[in-house]
Amino acid sequence: ARQQASKVEANALTVRLELMADCLSGIWATNVQGLMEKGDLQEALNAARKIGDDHLQRQAGRVPQPHTFTHGTSEQRARWFARGYESGDVGQCDTFAAARL
């Protein structure tokens, strides 16, 4: 049971790191707007949704198991990317201080 708890805790920390990376990617995207083509932002949000753990597990024919997630849900990934994009502020990407992911 202890080893399982450690794995669940490690997964939860990994989710926070991955969502922070999504947010930082959003900041990058907002700073290179002149280099992006029309539709790139929507494509990035769609990609974030497609690589959410819940989506990937469903695609594999399984019921999503949140305790096994290592990247966050589709909704979380898109929301944190958008948060970085809209704010442009690294301080808004602190997933470890966030009460809600």
Positions of predicted regions on the chain:
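Pan-zinc metallopeptidase signature
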Residues: 52-101
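Post-HEXXH active-site segment of zinc metalloproteases
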Residues: 1-18
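Charge-dense, low-complexity intrinsically disordered segments
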Residues: 11, 15, 35, 68
